[in-house]
């Protein structure tokens, strides 16, 4: 149903956000920004 779609979208968004935060953090640590 709709709830499972919403959950999937939220999961994907969370994954993307985590990926973005990780890459930002690692580039700051490596000073490659």
UniProtKB/Swiss-Prot annotation:
This is Gaegurin-3. It is found in: Secreted. Expressed by the skin glands. One of its GO terms (biological process) is defense response to bacterium. Monomer. The keyword Zinc-finger does not apply. The keyword Disulfide bond applies. Disulfide bonds join 27-33. It holds the Pfam family Antimicrobial_2. InterPro entries: Antimicrobial_frog_2. GO terms for cellular component: extracellular region. It comes from Glandirana rugosa. It comes from the Eukaryota. Has a non-hemolytic activity. Has a broad spectrum of activity against both Gram-positive and Gram-negative bacteria, fungi and protozoa. Belongs to the frog skin active peptide (FSAP) family. Brevinin subfamily. Keywords: Amphibian defense peptide, Antibiotic, Antimicrobial, Disulfide bond, Secreted.
């Amino acid at each position: 149903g709709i709830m499972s779609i919403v959950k999937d979208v939220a999961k994907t968004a969370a994954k993307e956000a985590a990926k973005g935060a990780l890459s930002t953090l690692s580039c700051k640590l490596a000073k490659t920004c």
